[in-house]
């Protein structure tokens, strides 16, 4: 039996955890147990909780500062010899303890920090297979490169970037951002071609971003039924319920991926923020995506890349009173819908390794054969 670890980061429910859950579910479906470990809460539980709150407050109240610092520290041209001494000081010994205690055969990293640490520690653990699983549509400088065995990449652009940085193309898999197996079944063309269209609005579960403001400015005209996915945001849920509007529905926290998949199946399109996992789920389901807000840092970067490839519609500068007309016109336009499908099919067609279960089987088989040599 393989000993498999998955490393997200922080305890807040971000894309790192959703991808970790997707990998864990896929491995378990193959009869393999995998343990998720957040090195921060594992090592400094109280500090992690404080840091999570501080992070959310920072991006909420000082978005430009966060964006600037993120671009300065995490973006730009990759430097092979760049060191992050604070991270090493805080977490290297903690990671060693985890590796010594758990004795993993394979480690999947869904966040850059554990990837950085394992990249540095890998020479001490030559039999350990380390896999980077990228959860955004770009790769920042912190992710480990040199000693990482495999890379699950979101696009051909990222594959080309990694090859230019010296990564062997045979170790790169074009998986897209992995989504839970519940979302992998592609929908038939069930999009409504006449109003009222069903639009899911999501992206407010953590209480940051512009979702409440957006909902407050909704002006339903009968062409769209809005379903607001509130998650654990009680303030948002209470507000939407208090409207008592027949065309604005509050959806409480969903307890399973199957429930979310059913909601996707009922939808004509999605209004959301450009988080890597949500966008990947929508692309998988071929649901048109309208972006109403982007958090500083990763989401800004994602949006730029997605907009460039015409995979999403940026509605941040739309006249709110006319937004419903614009969206309805999009669905009623054969030309716009055809163009959208062309770009999405083009993107999905590039994902030569989309069946994540097959990629996992291949990696596990290779790891087993390596140990037998």
Swiss-Prot record:
GO CC annotation: membrane
InterPro entries according to UniProt: Diacylglyc_glucosyltr_N (IPR009695), Glycosyltransf_28_UgtP (IPR050519)
Gene3D superfamilies, per database record: Glycogen Phosphorylase B (3.40.50.2000)
Domain of life where this protein originates: Bacteria
Keywords attached to this entry: Glycosyltransferase, Transferase
E.C. number: 2.4.-.-
Gene Ontology biological process terms in this record: glycolipid biosynthetic process
Example of a GO MF term: hexosyltransferase activity
Annotated SUPFAM superfamilies: UDP-Glycosyltransferase/glycogen phosphorylase (SSF53756)
Stretch forming the signal peptide: none
Stated family: Belongs to the glycosyltransferase 28 family.
Full protein name: Uncharacterized glycosyltransferase YkoN
Organism of origin: Bacillus subtilis (strain 168)
């Amino acid at each position: 039996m393989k000993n498999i670890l998955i490393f997200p980061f922080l305890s807040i429910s971000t894309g790192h955890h959703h991808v970790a859950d997707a990998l864990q579910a896929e491995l378990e479906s193959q009869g393999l147990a995998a343990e998720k470990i957040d090195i921060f809460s594992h090592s400094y539980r109280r500090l992690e909780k404080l840091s999570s709150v501080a992070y959310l407050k920072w991006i909420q109240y000082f978005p430009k500062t966060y964006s600037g610092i993120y671009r300065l520290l995490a973006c730009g041209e990759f430097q092979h010899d760049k060191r992050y001494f604070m991270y090493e000081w805080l977490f290297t010994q903690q990671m060693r303890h985890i590796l010594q205690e758990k004795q993993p055969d394979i480690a999947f990293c869904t966040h850059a920090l554990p990837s950085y640490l394992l990249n540095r520690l890998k020479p001490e653990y030559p039999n350990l297979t380390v896999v980077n699983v990228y959860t955004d549509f770009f790769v920042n400088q912190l992710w480990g490169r040199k000693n990482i065995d495999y890379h699950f990449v979101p696009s051909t652009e990222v594959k080309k970037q990694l090859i230019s940085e010296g990564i062997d193309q045979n170790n790169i898999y074009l998986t897209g951002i992995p989504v839970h197996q519940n979302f992998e079944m592609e929908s038939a063309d069930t999009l409504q071609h006449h109003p009222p269209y069903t639009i899911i609005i999501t992206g407010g579960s953590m209480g940051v971003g512009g979702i409440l403001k957006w909902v407050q400015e909704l002006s339903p005209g009968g062409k769209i039924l809005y379903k607001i996915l509130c998650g654990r945001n009680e303030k948002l849920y209470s507000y939407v319920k208090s409207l008592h509007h027949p065309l604005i529905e509050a959806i409480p926290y969903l307890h399973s991926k199957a429930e979310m998949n059913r909601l996707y199946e009922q939808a004509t399109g999605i209004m959301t923020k450009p988080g890597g996992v949500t966008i990947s789920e929508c692309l998988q389901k071929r649901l048109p995506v309208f972006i109403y807000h982007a958090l500083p840092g990763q989401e800004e970067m994602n949006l730029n890349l997605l907009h460039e490839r015409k995979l999403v519609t940026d509605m941040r500068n739309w006249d709110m009173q006319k937004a419903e007309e614009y969206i309805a016109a999009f669905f009623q336009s054969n030309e716009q819908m055809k163009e959208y499908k062309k770009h999405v099919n083009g993107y999905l067609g590039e994902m030569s390794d989309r069946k994540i279960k097959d990629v996992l089987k291949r990696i596990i088989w290779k790891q087993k054969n390596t140990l037998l040599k």
